[in-house]
């Protein structure tokens, strides 16, 4: 499954996680991506959308 939102372009972020003793380990933060059927240019299509775009109404779902 794609790890990028097709509406806002939000994707995976790389960084460093610190423990209490300040040891480092590399890790990734992935967005909450959902596969939904939406209306794109008048036709229903399956796209990958983050949960924030779904909640804010940037996507019109196909029923």
From Swiss-Prot:
GO cellular component terms listed in the entry, alphabetical order: ribonucleoprotein complex; ribosome
Keyword tags: Ribonucleoprotein, Ribosomal protein
Keyword Ribonucleoprotein: yes
GO MF, one annotated term: structural constituent of ribosome
Pfam families xref list: Ribosomal_L28 (PF00830)
Alphabetical list of InterPro entries matching this protein: Bacterial_rp_bL28 (IPR050096), Ribosomal_bL28 (IPR026569), Ribosomal_bL28/bL31-like_sf (IPR034704), Ribosomal_bL28_bact-type (IPR001383), Ribosomal_bL28_sf (IPR037147)
Cited Gene3D superfamilies: Ribosomal protein L28/L24
Keyword Signal assigned: no
GO biological process: translation
Domain of life (superkingdom): Bacteria
Entry similarity comment: Belongs to the bacterial ribosomal protein bL28 family.
Protein name as catalogued: Large ribosomal subunit protein bL28
């Amino acid at each position: 499954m794609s790890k990028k939102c097709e509406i806002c372009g939000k994707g995976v972020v790389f960084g460093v996680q610190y423990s209490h003793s300040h040891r480092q380990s590399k890790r990734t933060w992935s967005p909450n991506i959902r596969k939904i059927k939406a209306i794109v240019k008048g036709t229903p299509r399956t796209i990958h959308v983050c949960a924030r775009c779904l909640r804010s109404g940037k996507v019109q779902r196909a029923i």
